[in-house]
Structures are given as structure tokens and as C-alpha cells.
């Protein structure tokens, strides 16, 4: 193994960045930023937009670093995660703890300084929900880990909304509900084609504990529920027809994937569905933003 002393600063930086799971963090922060814009009819104050974005990113990164630390032995047994620096022993436990503490402290200070105490405490609660409740308790103990633990991962829109208004109204909770319902089918399609990984690691993911057919059925059921839930922004009056059309179109494609997985499963199909689920959530929240500012202009 390459020693720490022989590594270039760029290589070391990349290793620490990998602990924050950049792609997952980017999606979470993106949803939080959308929540900021939806919270106001005008422009989000720059100090809130920048400070809130940085603060949420820092605390999210801290939570993911703790996740990597706790799961380093599990990650080492799984092909999908064996490359992580924590799994390879390239970063020590004290280093990860210090890194997470620095990120978390900086994130909390940034949110308190540039947004408000509510946003800081909600984000800290989200950190605890993911890094402690989900990672330490739910994930290794129950096949419903994704369903219950999805609550913490669904919080970013509420965090963004709170950063702007200092409150979390009903519309913000609708956005949270969308991500909450999206989470199980998103992760279950991954668990289907990575079943052996999870089985070897001893994690009670749904395909491992209840089998492939049961999981495929529940992916379909949750996707149907998701389709219905994504209509709520239009029904509540938060969004207009631009969003509605986007939600129906995007949801129809997701439903088609879920139906195909249920009727004629293949690992390749599950991989495509997993990739689409990420695109789906990104485009759905982008549609919320476009609709938010286009609606007054179009009058619909």
C-alpha cells in the first residue's frame, strides 16, 4: 500500500473528497437549493444562497464521511465500494473523525451565521439521522432500512426552504415526501443487481431477506405511489401545468421501468432504472424551479 507520506497533495485531497460521496452530496444540495428558490417569489438573498449551499454541503459531507468510517469493513467486501479510501485503509479512523468534525463544525457555523438557527439545527438533525440512526442502527438491522432511514435523506428541500424563510411550511414537506417515496425504489433496483454484494457483506437489504420477486413487486408499488405523490405540488397550488406535464412524463418513464423490472427482470434493466431514477429526481426538481418562475409569466 502506498504510504501517506509518498502521496501528492492532489491525491490526498481526492481521497478526502471521496469520503463525502460527491455525487450523492451534489444531488442533495441541488434539491436543497431548489427548496430555497421555491420558498420565495423573487430572488434568494445572495448570502443565504451561498451560505446555505456551503453549509448544507459541509454537513452532508461530514455525515457521509462518518458513514464511510462505520462501513469501511462492509465496503471492503463489496465490489461497488471497495475502492473507497476508507475501505482500502488509506485514511485512518482518527483522520476521518477529524475530517468529519471539521466539516460538520464549519457547516454548522456557516448555517448559523448566514441563514438561521432553525436551518442549522434541522441540518444537524439530518446529520444524526443519517450518520447514526440509519448507518449504525437501521441499515445493519432491518430490510426496511431504506424506507425508515429515507427520512433523513429526504430533508434537503426543507433545509433549503428553512434557510430562506426560517420556517418549514406544508409545501416544503410535500417536497420532502417526494424524495422519501422516491428513495426505496431508487435503492432497491440497485440492491437487485448488487444482491450478492449485500449478501456477502451481511446487510439485510430487501432482495437478500425477501427475495427478488418480492422486491420487484415493491419497486412497482412504490413507483406507483411516487407517481401519485408527485402530483401533489400541482394539486396544492404550489406548481402549475409546466411542472405537472413534466411530472407526468418523467413518472410515466419511471413506471415503465418499474413494470418491466416486475415482469421481465434483468441486471442490465435494473442498472438502467437506477441511472434513470437519479436523472428523474434531478429533472423533476428542475421542473419545479422552471415552473416556479415561468408560471407568473405564462399565467398557468
UniProtKB/Swiss-Prot annotation:
Known catalytic reactions: heme b + (2E,6E)-farnesyl diphosphate + H2O = Fe(II)-heme o + diphosphate
GO biological process terms on file: heme O biosynthetic process
Enzyme Commission (EC) number: 2.5.1.141
Enzyme class: transferase
Lineage top rank: taxon: Bacteria
Entry GO MF terms: protoheme IX farnesyltransferase activity
Assigned GO CC terms: plasma membrane
Protein keywords: Cell inner membrane, Cell membrane, Heme biosynthesis, Membrane, Transferase, Transmembrane, Transmembrane helix
Membrane topology note: Multi-pass membrane protein
UniProt-listed CDD domains: PT_UbiA_Cox10
Family matches, as Gene3D superfamilies: UbiA prenyltransferase
Location in the cell: Cell inner membrane
Pathway(s) the chain acts in: Porphyrin-containing compound metabolism; heme O biosynthesis; heme O from protoheme: step 1/1
Residue stretches spanning the membrane: 24-44, 46-66, 94-114, 118-138, 146-166, 172-192, 224-244, 278-298
Additional information: Carbon 2 of the heme B porphyrin ring is defined according to the Fischer nomenclature.
Similarity section: Belongs to the UbiA prenyltransferase family. Protoheme IX farnesyltransferase subfamily.
Function: Converts heme B (protoheme IX) to heme O by substitution of the vinyl group on carbon 2 of heme B porphyrin ring with a hydroxyethyl farnesyl side group.
HAMAP family: CyoE_CtaB
The name this protein goes by in its record: Protoheme IX farnesyltransferase
